[in-house]
Amino acid sequence: LFLNPHDMPTAIAEYARRTEQPVPESVGDYVRCILESLALKYWWVMEGIQGLTGVSYDCIHVVGGGTQNAFLMQLTADVTGQTVVAGPVEATAIGNILVQAMALGAVRDRRHLRQVVRKSFDVRSYQPQELSPEGKEARRRFLALDQ
């Protein structure tokens, strides 16, 4: 649906109309809609994973460029009710380098690899805040949509 539309704002507006949701009017409305949708989808996926595995997670690790968006990271923490650990930003390149280092014997194992990452790169933690009534309503509406 939103994978690669020709015109993303139009696709969002049409979906909002079709699902009887408020249609974004400004650039800020669209940005907020997208970020809230991402956070809600993270919550939905985490609920599914926890339901399938029976394992409860108290922390979500997010890597890559999206971690630079503090609003998205805090929103994710709030919506999921879980601590978000954000970073490192350049996770793909770092991972490739460290796997090569492991192959060359410079990194002993995955435990050592994770230790190198923790000591070498900045990460930021976001603690969940109580979800507002509007946030709870957004989760309810999100669940009502056809996933």
Where are these regions (language model features)?
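Glycine/Thr-rich phosphate-binding loops that ligate phosphate moieties of nucleotide
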Residues: 1-147
